[in-house]
Amino acid sequence: MSDGAAARRWGKCGPPCSRESIMVAFKGVWTQAFWKAVTAEFLAMLIFVLLSVGSTINWGGSENPLPVDMVLISLCFGLSIATMVQCFGHISGGHINPAVTVAMVCTRKISIAKSVFYITAQCLGAIIGAGILYLVTPPSVVGGLGVTTVHGNLTAGHGLLVELIITFQLVFTIFASCDSKRTDVTGSVALAIGFSVAIGHLFAINYTGASMNPARSFGPAVIMGNWENHWIYWVGPIIGAVLAGALYEYVFCPDVELKRRLKEAFSKAAQQTKGSYMEVEDNRSQVETEDLILKPGVVHVIDIDRGDEKKGKDSSGEVLSSV
């Protein structure tokens, strides 16, 4: 295709992958706060996998295995995630779980661009955490290194449903605990999330290993090369997380003010001339405004033809993007 034909095809705005389009989509990537958040997700996942998966090691070895201590494993996973959320929640939001990140994208709390970096960091952290655990564990007791597997008497469909259910209750707890509209939450949000993880393990360890976290399953699977039914630990948790986030955000506790602002935003977007686009932002927190969170408090319109910016601001309460 000639340059002239390409220009006519894409119009004045240029192709969707133009340098300007990419710069706008990933504008928050160039900030220090953004990379601190991504690094926090990486480090939190590394520590979480190292500590929690370490509790699954059977020190009796394959010849004389010890009974599985479900309470020990459940408490270790729950307290580990609570500790990481408490440590890193104010830096990155403390997702520490790709399923939670996807749920945040679907409820417009972060952008797709930011989620890509978060999920990548989470998966890398899980791999390195599992690798360190493998390195420091005697070969005679490594076993499966905590690889999550479906019980032999269950089908893949059963495993998928169990992972969906336990992740649903986890993410619903996250959204409910972090709802800034609530005035009755006085306890520790991190501890509430930790208890939710522990409950999921107490119920589902014997069913599927109780993942609730695709990265937690991904790290040990990479190190051990065991991919049996691995897709379950991505599909189940992500579906459960999206359902929980959507039900809480749009059905049980919808934000009336947010709906009004979005309606105004789309109305203004419809009135813009061809060659303009609109994105929704918020100016609530200086820690967050420099990165890629999708925020509904500000209507930000850039006219590509004129190269100027127009902003229509509206006051809003804080929407917590935590965990």
From Swiss-Prot:
GO terms for biological process: carbon dioxide transport; cell-cell adhesion; cellular response to estradiol stimulus; cellular response to glucose stimulus; cellular response to interleukin-1; cellular response to interleukin-6; cellular response to type II interferon; cerebrospinal fluid circulation. GO terms for molecular function: identical protein binding; water channel activity. A motif (NPA 1) lies at residues 97-99. The modification Phosphothreonine is found at T289. Disulfide bonds: none annotated. It is found in: Cell membrane; Basolateral cell membrane; Endosome membrane; Cell membrane, Sarcolemma. One of its GO terms (cellular component) is sarcolemma. The modification Phosphoserine is found at S111, S180, S276, S285, S321. Changing H201P: Partial loss of transport activity. Residues 1-36, 90-93, 102-115, 177-184, 253-323 are cytoplasmic. Homotetramer. The tetramers can form oligomeric arrays in membranes. The size of the oligomers differs between tissues and is smaller in skeletal muscle than in brain. Interaction between AQP4 oligomeric arrays in close-by cells can contribute to cell-cell adhesion. Part of a complex containing MLC1, TRPV4, HEPACAM and ATP1B1. This is Aquaporin-4. It comes from Rattus norvegicus (Rat). The gene is Aqp4.
